Amino acid sequence: MIYLHRIYFIIVLFTLIFHGRLGFSDNNKLHEAEVRALKEIGKKLGKKDWDFNKDPCSGEGTWIVTTYTTKGFESNITCDCSFLPQNSSCHVIRIALKSQNLTGIVPPEFSKLRHLKVLDLSRNSLTGSIPKEWASMRLEDLSFMGNRLSGPFPKVLTRLTMLRNLSLEGNQFSGPIPPDIGQLVHLEKLHLPSNAFTGPLTEKLGLLKNLTDMRISDNNFTGPIPDFISNWTRILKLQMHGCGLDGPIPSSISSLTSLTDLRISDLGGKPSSFPPLKNLESIKTLILRKCKIIGPIPKYIGDLKKLKTLDLSFNLLSGEIPSSFENMKKADFIYLTGNKLTGGVPNYFVERNKNVDVSFNNFTDESSIPSHDCNRVTSNLVESFALGNKSHKGSTCFLQRMPCVHPKRYHLYKLYINCGGGEVKVDKEITYQADDEPKGASMYVLGANKRWALSSTGNFMDNDDDADEYTVQNTSRLSVNASSPSFGLYRTARVSPLSLTYYGICLGNGNYTVNLHFAEIIFTDDNTLYSLGKRLFDIYVQDQLVIKNFNIQEAARGSGKPIIKSFLVNVTDHTLKIGLRWAGKGTTGIPIRGVYGPMISAISVEPNFKPPVYYDTKDIILKVGVPVAAATLLLFIIVGVFWKKRRDKNDIDKELRGLDLQTGTFTLRQIKAATDNFDVTRKIGEGGFGSVYKGELSEGKLIAVKQLSAKSRQGNREFVNEIGMISALQHPNLVKLYGCCVEGNQLILVYEYLENNCLSRALFGKDESSRLKLDWSTRKKIFLGIAKGLTFLHEESRIKIVHRDIKASNVLLDKDLNAKISDFGLAKLNDDGNTHISTRIAGTIGYMAPEYAMRGYLTEKADVYSFGVVALEIVSGKSNTNFRPTEDFVYLLDWAYVLQERGSLLELVDPTLASDYSEEEAMLMLNVALMCTNASPTLRPTMSQVVSLIEGKTAMQELLSDPSFSTVNPKLKALRNHFWQNELSRSLSFSTSGPRTASANSLVDAEEKTGLLD
C-alpha cells in the first residue's frame, strides 16, 4: 500500500505527457512567486550560476546540469507543469544541489515552494539548523547528509508528517532523539549516523513500522538495544556501528525476516550468547563485530544461502568452525578474526580464492597448518594457532606471537617502514623500506628483509568500487617542506577498513622507542566535501590499547600535518606488534560512501640500548692472520683471569644476560651525574629494596633513580623481574619505567619523576607543610586511578600481576595529582590466573589480606583488600595503622566497621573537607572500600567491578543489601585482631612445609576451616 501513491503518480504523469500537458509553452512557466523564492534561496546559498534569464522549468541554461566531474555532484531543478487548468503555471517539485560546496545557513525561503516534495542538499557546508518556517512544507524526501548543521534534533522535522526518507547523516546534531519522531509514521528511511546524539533510543521509534532502512552508527547513545526493533518487520537494512548502545542483541531480532543487511559493532555491556538469526533467510550482509558474543557459532549460519559478507570478528566466540560453512559458496568475505576458535582450519577455507580471515584465534589442530608461508596462503591465518610449546610444522607466522627461530646474531634492532609507499631514504643511515603491496582485503605481507610483516583485514564496503585501494596517495596540502628528507613519508599511507597489524619479527629483546607517523592525506581543511570526513580508530601496542578513538586531524590540528605518536615498548619475546582497528566511529558517507578506517604513514623502531655486535670468526682470521690471533689468545687469558677475580660481582650481569634482557639504557656515569653521585640531598625516599633519588639528565629531564640494595639474592632476582616484566606494562596509572643501569653489582632502575611524591605524604605527612590540600574531586580521581591501575595489572595486561604491597606510600602523584602505582619489586607473576601459595609473605602490616598473611594464599583479591584500606585512607585522610580513636581499636578499618554498624559512616570523611564533598559519592566510596576488605576473598569484588561501581556503570544496591558485604562477623574481627597483634608481630616471612597447591575451591575450604565463612 505504501507504494500505491507512487504508482498512481507515475500513471497520471504518463497520461499528462501523452496528452501534451508537460510542454514548455509561454503559458507553462514557473510561478512568479516561486521564481522570487529561488532568487532568495540562490542568494543565501551563494548559488551564482542560476540563470534567471531562462525559465527554471524550461530545462535550459544552468537549471539542469548533465555534465560534471565531481562524483556525487548534482544540480537539478524538476518542475511539474501538469497542474489543471491546462494553462496554469508550473511548480518546483524537486531540488537537488549535491556536492557543490554551498555555505551559509539553511534558507527559510524553501518553505515558499509549496509543491516541493524532494530536497537534497547533501555534501555541502551548510550551518545552523532547520528553519521553523519549514513546518508547513509537504516534503517526502529530505537529505542534509554531509553538512555542518548543529544543535538538538530539529523538532520542526517531526511536523513534516509526509516524510518517507530523512537523512541527517554526517552533521553535528546532539542530544536525544525526541519522542515526537513517532509522528513520522510514513518514514521508510531514517539515516542518523555520524552525529553526537545521546541518551537512550526513544520507544516512539517503535511506531515507525514502515521503516526499511535504519542507520544510527557513530553516535553516543546509551542503554541497551531496545526490544521494539521487532516492530520494524519491513526493514531491509539495519546499521548500528559504534553507536554507544549496550548488548545483548535482543532475541526479538529474529522477527525481522526481511533483513538483507544487518551491521552491529562495538557494543557495551556484558558478554552474551549468539542472537537467534535462523529466520533471516534473506540476509546478504551480516556484521556482528566486537559485540561481546560468547559461545559457539551456530550451525545455521553456514546454511544462509544468500549470505555474501560475514563478519564476526573480535568477539569471544569459541568451539570449532561449523562444517556447514562449506556450503557458503556465494560468500565473498568471511571474517572470523580475533576470537577464541579452536579445532582446525577447514581446507576449504585455506584453498578458496575468496577473502577469508581467521587470524588471531586459538586453533589447536596442527594438521590443518598450511605447509607453506602465510603470504602464500589465500586466506589470512596469521597468529591463528595456539600450540603452546609443542613442536610444529610450517611457518611460525601461523602461531601466536610469531616465535622467533633465528639465533641471536640474526636478531633485528632497528626497523623503518614507509607504510603504503616505496623506499624512502631520509639520511645516510636511515632508509624506510617499501610497503606498497596494493591488495589488502584479507592478506599477510612479509617485508623485503623478512624482519617485518603486516596483516590486513576487511574490505571497503559500499564504495561501488571493485578495485579497493589499500594504499593511498596524498590529496591534501602537506604541511611538510618538499625538500625535507621526511617529505616522502607522508605522500602515501596504508589504509584498512577494519584491522591493520604490523609486526617486528625477531627483534632483540629490550626497550625500544616506537614512533608511529600519521598525516591525514584524504580529508582536507577547506570547504569542500573532503573537509567533512572524520576518521577515528584505536591504536594497540603489544596487544594493549594505548589510544582510543584516535583522530589524526585533531591530534595534528589539521589535515596534511604530520603527527608522531611515540611509545616506550619492552620487547620480551622477540616480537613487536602494532595494531590499528576501526571501532565503528567516524563517517561512512563522506566524501563518498564507504568505510574510512585506520591510516598510517610510517613506522620507526629504535633501541634504547646499545645492540650487541656479532663477528664472523672465519673472516677475522683470514683478514688479520696469526699474529692477531695470538694477541687475541693472550687477551682471552688476561680476561679469563680478570673474570675469575670478579665473577662474584658479575653474577647479576650474567643473570640478566641469560634472560636476554637488553635494557642498559643508562650508564653509571650518567646516573651519578644526574644524582650528584647519589648525594643525600637528592634522596626522596626509601623503598623495599633500596633508596630512591631525584635525578636530572643532561637534557634537563627529571628522573627517579631507584638504587637496589645488594643485601640479598632474593632482592637481585626481584630486580630482574622488574626489568624483564614491568617495563612491558604501560598504563596511565602505573609509574613508567624508563630503563636501567647494570654495571658490576650496581643495579639501578630509572623511573619517571612524579612531582607530588606519594599519597601517604599528601594525606598524612609528618608536618602540615608536606601535606597537600586534596579536594573531593581530586580524592575521587586518585581513588579511581588506583582502581584502574590494579584492573590493568589483574585483568587487562598480557602478563597478570599481583602487586602484594598496595599502600598509600606505593601510590605516587604526578603534577596533575593523577595516581600512579609504583614498586613492583614485590610482584609475582600469576600467568594462569589460578590461586597459588606464596612461600614468602611480602607486604605491610595493616594492609595485608588475612588469607595471604596467615595462610600464604595469594590471588588478586589480596590486592583488592589492600586497596580497600587505602580507599578508607583517601576518604578519611587518616592512616590505617596510626589512627586509634580509642584503645579498643587497632586500626582505622575497625573504627569504620563500627561506624557502619551505627549508620554513621560519613563521620569518617576528612574533616578538613568540611561540607565541600558529595555525601552520595562518599557513601559509595566508603561502602566499596568495606566490600573490598571483606574477610572472605571470594566475597570481595574484582577491581574492574570497583571501577564500574565508582563510574556508575553498575548499581550498588544489590550488593549493599547482602549482609556479607556490609557487616563483619565478630569472630572474624577477633581473628583478625589476634593475628595482627600476635602472629604478624613475630615475622613477616615463613616457608610452607612441602609443596602445596590451591584452587578456588581449596581457598573456600580453608576459609571454612578457619571460621572465615561461619
UniProtKB/Swiss-Prot annotation:
Main subcellular localisation: membrane
UniProt LRR repeat ranges: 89-112, 113-137, 139-160, 161-184, 186-207, 208-234, 256-279, 280-304, 305-327, 329-352, 354-376, 516-539
One Pfam family in the UniProt entry: PK_Tyr_Ser-Thr
InterPro entries: Kinase-like_dom_sf, Leu-rich_rpt, Leu-rich_rpt_typical-subtyp, LRR_dom_sf, LRR_Rcpt-Like_S/T_Kinase, Malectin_dom, Prot_kinase_dom, Protein_kinase_ATP_BS
Membrane spanning residue stretches: 620-640
A GO-annotated cellular component: membrane
Entry protein name: Probable LRR receptor-like serine/threonine-protein kinase At1g07650
Native organism: Arabidopsis thaliana (Mouse-ear cress)
